[in-house]
C-alpha cells in the first residue's frame, strides 16, 4: 500500500538541528522520517525514542550487512525500538536476510538495499566486479530479498516496474533519489521527480535536501507531498 507522506531524510549532524527543523511543522503533523547511519551512530537510540514520542513514523536506514547470526542479534535489538521500517543489504545473502526477517517478524517492515542510487555501472564493474547492468543487478537482488521473505527493497524509481514484474505487485519499492523538477541532483545519479515516482509505481519516496535545506521546509514538504499524490 502506497504511503502518502514523503519520507524526510533527517541528514543532520546534531540532535539540536533536528529539533530546530521540526519547529517548522505544527505539533499535530505526524511525519515519516528517515534516520541514517551518521545520525544514529552520533546520537544512538535516544533519537528514535524522541521522534516516536512525538508520534512520527521511523525509517531506520542502517543497511545491516554481516554474518547471519550477527545481523539476527542486531535486528532483535532494533525490533524493540518501535521503528516502522529498517534496512539490510541484499548483498549479505538470502540466509542473512531471512534470519533478520525471522527475528523482526511483523514489528516493522524489512527492506533490502539493492544498489545505492550513487552507484554507476562503472562502479559496479570496477569495485564490485559485477559485469551486468545496474538494472539487472537490482532485479536479481530484489528476487533474493523476496525469496528471503522481506517486505521489499530500496531502489531507484527507474527500476520499480522491473522489480514489481520480477517479484509481486505488493512487494514494496522504497525510492530515494527523488528531486522536484528543476532541482539539483547532487551526488545521486539515478533520480526522478515525485510525480514520475508515483506514476511508475513507487510505494515510498525518500526526500532529503530539497526539504531540509529549503528556506521554508514546511512549504517544501507540502509541495513535494502534493506532487507525490497528484
Swiss-Prot record:
A Pfam family that the UniProt record links to this protein: OMPdecase
GO cellular component, one term: cytosol
Entry superkingdom: Bacteria
Class of this enzyme: lyase
PROSITE patterns, A to Z: OMPDECASE
Entry keywords, A to Z: Decarboxylase, Lyase, Pyrimidine biosynthesis
Catalytic activity, as annotated: orotidine 5'-phosphate + H(+) = UMP + CO2
Name of the featured protein: Orotidine 5'-phosphate decarboxylase
Upper classification of the organism: Bacteria, Bacillati, Bacillota, Bacilli, Lactobacillales
Amino acid at each position: 500500500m502506497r504511503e502518502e507522506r514523503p519520507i524526510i531524510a533527517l541528514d543532520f549532524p546534531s540532535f539540536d538541528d533536528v529539533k530546530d527543523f521540526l519547529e517548522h511543522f505544527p505539533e499535530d503533523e505526524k511525519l515519516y522520517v528517515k534516520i541514517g547511519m551518521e545520525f544514529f551512530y552520533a546520537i544512538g537510540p535516544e533519537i528514535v525514542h524522541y521522534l516516536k514520542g512525538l508520534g512520527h513514523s521511523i525509517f531506520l536506514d542502517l543497511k545491516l550487512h554481516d554474518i547471519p547470526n550477527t545481523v539476527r542479534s542486531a535486528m532483535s535489538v532494533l525490533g524493540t525500538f518501535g521503528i516502522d521500517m529498517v534496512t539490510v543489504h541484499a548483498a549479505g545473502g538470502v540466509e542473512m536476510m531471512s534470519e533478520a526477517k525471522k527475528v523482526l517478524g511483523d514489528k516493522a517492515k524489512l527492506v533490502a538495499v539493492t544498489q545505492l542510487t550513487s552507484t554507476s555501472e562503472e562502479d559496479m564493474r570496477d569495485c564490485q566486479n559485477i559485469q551486468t547492468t545496474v538494472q539487472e543487478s537490482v532485479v536479481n537482488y530484489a528476487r533474493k530479498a523476496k525469496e528471503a521473505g522481506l517486505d521489499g527493497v530500496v531502489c531507484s524509481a527507474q527500476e520499480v516496474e522491473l522489480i514489481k514484474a520480477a517479484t509481486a505487485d505488493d512487494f514494496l519499492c522504497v525510492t530515494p533519489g527523488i528531486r522536484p523538477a528543476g532541482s539539483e541532483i547532487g551526488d545521486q545519479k539515478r533520480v526522478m521527480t515525485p510525480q514520475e515516482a508515483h506514476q511508475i509505481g513507487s510505494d515510498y519516496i525518500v526526500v532529503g535536501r530539497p526539504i531540509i535545506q529549503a528556506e521554508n521546509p514546511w512549504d517544501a514538504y507540502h509541495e513535494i507531498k502534493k506532487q507525490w499524490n497528484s
